[in-house]
Amino acid sequence: MTFQVECVESRTEADQGQYGRFSIEPLARGQGTTVGNALRRVLLSNLEGTAVTAVRIGGVNHEFATIPGVREDVLDILLNVRELVVHAHSPQPQIGRLRVVGPATVTAADVDFGPEVEVINPNHYIASLSEGATLEMELKVEWGTGYRAIDRSHDETTALDFLQLDAVFMPVRRVNYSVEDARVGESTAIDRLVLEVWTNGSLSPQEALSQAASCLVALFEPLKNVSVGSTHTADPEPTPESQTPIEDLQLSVRAYNCLKRAQVNSVADLLSYTYEDLLEIKNFGQKSAEEVVEALERIGIKLQESKVS
């Protein structure tokens, strides 16, 4: 059964967000819920978007400061900047710059991002300046998916005087779906899927739906070539080096104790970890992980780069 997708309603909201309502039919009984749930999850979680991730403000080195002649404090300005909706045409991080002298009302339209970044909500309010006040800012824009909280310990690309923001990359704000009864000829055991999509304006609902469908196709594509035969492979013979207890690796007390608490007793146990896995061990920092990598290299062993699926 071949179904059709029709956009039955679309509009642009007052805040430049976009809305689209789609009808997908005919679907076999039960497929409406299956397709609707899968699309909703991907639309809300897996689509890439751009967001302002860090801000540098002239004369400011922490978020609890105030700026002479500016009505908002720095924390309020950061919250306003976080609500900027932008769309970058380049995968590389971009920098936008702003310099306004009061009296003035500062909006997103005052930020100069250059040709690589489009501001979707240029009327978005940022701050108010009194006579003689000056506001200078640099805004960093990046691509990402989902939500990224501030993580100062792992950000090596942002200068120290940039104030980081919790970044919301999701271009889709909300998704609803419902399944209705439909008819094809004499058959009434047919589903009609009605899908509603709200975006922030950086992506149209039609584009969002297309990207979500592509994500699902890519996800299921490998299942087309599943081998019928046995996929079991014999475990490799353990090498003498893999049987080395971690006591012989001459690790620091901190690294050794963390590994022991994680039930890592030998090099063979370590080989089931990637570098990223080591960083997830409680109290096991980057310095300890580098120490383990160097110790393994001394005996001719390297950690696996990724989990074997």
Curated annotation (Swiss-Prot):
A GO CC annotation given for this chain: cytoplasm
Stated family: Belongs to the RNA polymerase alpha chain family.
Subunit structure: In cyanobacteria the RNAP catalytic core is composed of 2 alpha, 1 beta, 1 beta', 1 gamma and 1 omega subunit. When a sigma factor is associated with the core the holoenzyme is formed, which can initiate transcription.
Domain notes: The N-terminal domain is essential for RNAP assembly and basal transcription, whereas the C-terminal domain is involved in interaction with transcriptional regulators and with upstream promoter elements.
Top EC class of this enzyme: transferase
Organism encoding this protein: Synechococcus elongatus (strain ATCC 33912 / PCC 7942 / FACHB-805) (Anacystis nidulans R2)
EC id: 2.7.7.6
Lineage: Bacteria, Bacillati, Cyanobacteriota, Cyanophyceae, Synechococcales
Gene coding for it: rpoA
Name of this protein: DNA-directed RNA polymerase subunit alpha
Stretch list, region Alpha C-terminal domain (alpha-CTD): 237-309
